Amino acid sequence: MATTPLPNALSAYRLLLRATRIAFQGDFTTLHAARAEARKHFDQNRRLGVDTPKHIQHAVETAEILRTNVVQGVRVEGSGEAGKEEQRYELRIHEHIERGDNDTIKTAGNKGIKAAVGKTCSQS
């Protein structure tokens, strides 16, 4: 089984910066904080060591999670019915967000469970 080779540290750092730009586009405060955190971790591990490949792999996996799983919401000002203020949020879903159906989640919990239709718990 072939595995993909790990990028070098600079490539992983650039990959992480691109992922933060995609995930936090339009939110300068969070973008700046995420990039500062990435910089801090890369500076702490500037020297090559035994665990360098592990740190690079962590950066690559973090970038993948940021790019495919982080969705930001922005509060939308709007009036509810009869003067009640309603809290509404607009999600920024970009083309890199992982989309899928819930079929695997719905069927995952049903493995090995037999339910009798029409019976209550006390009748089983």
Curated annotation (Swiss-Prot):
Keyword Chaperone among record annotations: yes
Cellular component annotations (GO), alphabetically ordered: mitochondrial matrix
Keywords: Chaperone, Mitochondrion, Transit peptide
InterPro entries assigned: Complex1_LYR_dom (IPR008011), Complex1_LYR_LYRM7 (IPR045298), MZM1/LYRM7 (IPR050435)
Biological-process GO terms, alphabetical: mitochondrial respiratory chain complex III assembly
Cellular compartments annotated: Mitochondrion matrix
GO MF term (any one): protein folding chaperone
Record-linked CDD domains: Complex1_LYR_LYRM7
Keyword Chaperone (UniProt): yes
Function: Assembly factor required for Rieske Fe-S protein RIP1 incorporation into the cytochrome b-c1 (CIII) complex. Functions as a chaperone, binding to this subunit within the mitochondrial matrix and stabilizing it prior to its translocation and insertion into the late CIII dimeric intermediate within the mitochondrial inner membrane. Modulates the mitochondrial matrix zinc pool.
Entry's family note: Belongs to the complex I LYR family. MZM1 subfamily.
Subunit structure, interactors included: Interacts with RIP1.
Record protein name field: Mitochondrial zinc maintenance protein 1, mitochondrial
Higher taxonomy: Eukaryota, Fungi, Dikarya, Ascomycota, Pezizomycotina
